[in-house]
C-alpha cells in the first residue's frame, strides 16, 4: 500500500454560480471555495492552471492571431471558392479540422471554427503544442515538466480519448498503484452548457454522473492508497447568452477594407483588431465606442488582468462584450449558442470553483494557484510513498506556501 494519492480532477465550466447551491460532492469534498478565473477562454484558463502563471507570463491566450508571415494555412485559401453554405457547416469544418491538424502535426487543441477561408492565410494558430504534455507551453514549463524533472510517476488525461476511456485508464493505474499523482480533465459539461445554458435541467444529472465517477475512482484508489487527497475544480463558469450583436456588420460598414486597412478576429465574446494603416485605429475605435453592448479594454486594465501583450501579438485593440452578449456571426461560429464564457473575469458567471476534502489555504484565490496545490501534494506524496531511511513516515504539517 502507498500512503497518499493526490487526485486532481478538472470539470470544465463547472463555475461557482452553477455549482454553489447544488449537492455536488458535498459529502466527498465538503470544503468549497470560489476562485477568480483569468481573462480569456479555456485556451488560457487551462494553461494558467497547469503552469501556475498568468496569460502575460505563459503567452497562451487566444487561438488565432494576425501573423501572415508564419501562417500555416495558405494552402487552404482555395476553399474560399466553395459555397459558404457548405464551408460554414459545422460537420464540414470538423472534418477539415481533423485533416489539417494531422497534416500540420499540431499536438494541442485545434479547430478551424468559422475563420473565413478568404483570409485564413493572414492568421497563425497559437496552440501548436499541448499544455497537457511536458514542454507544451508557449513559454515556460507546466506541472508535467515539473513532475518529469523529479521523476514522479503520474497520470494525465489524453484529450484525444473520451471521458469514459480516460476514466478507465486512470482506474487501471489506481488498481496497479503505479502512480503518485493524477490529473483528470473532463470537458463534457462545457459542451452541454454551451448547448442548453447554465440553468437547464440537464445539468443536475451530468453532475450526478461525475460524482458517481469520482466516488468510483476514490474507491478503486482505496485498494492501493491509504488516503486520497481529492481536488475537483473548474477553469471558468458559463453565462447564458440572451442578446446577439453582429459586430462584423458594424465594422464592415466602415470605409475600410479587411486585410488592407485592418485585420480582426471575432471571437465569441470579444473582438481583437490589428491596424495596417495610419488613422485606421481611430476610425474603428470611434465606431466601437457607439456599441453599447460592450467596451474597449484599455492597456491599463489588460495589465491589471495580466493579459497585456506589449508586442500586440494577440491584438492591438480588444473589444469585450458585456456578460450575456454574444457576437453572431463570429469567427467561432455562424449561429448562436445558448451560453458562453470568456467575459470579464469579475462578471458574476465567470468565477471558477474548487471542491476538496482538504483544508484550502487562504492564499488559494485564483485558478493559477491550483498549480501550487498540485506541486505541494505531489511532493508530499513522493515523500510519503517512497520514504528514504532518514525520513519518518508520518505526514508533515499540511501547509501551503503563499503564492
Positions of the model-derived regions?
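Active-site-proximal N-terminal segment of extracellular/periplasmic enzymes that hydrolyze or transfer
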Residues: 1-41
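Residue-level preference for the first positions of well-ordered beta-strands
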Residues: 5-7, 179-183, 229
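Metal-dependent active-site segment of extracytoplasmic phospho-/sulfohydrolases and closely related
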Residues: 7-11, 16, 209-250
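Short, solvent-exposed turn/loop segments enriched in Gly/Ser/Thr/Pro and often Arg
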Residues: 32-53, 160-161
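His/Asp/Glu-rich, glycine-adjacent segments
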Residues: 53-197, 206-209, 289-293, 371-385, ...
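Acidic/histidine-rich catalytic neighborhood
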Residues: 227, 238-275
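Active-site neighborhoods of enzymes that stabilize oxyanions during catalysis
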Residues: 262-381, 403
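Short, basic, low-complexity termini and linkers enriched in Ser/Thr/Gly/Pro
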Residues: 383-403
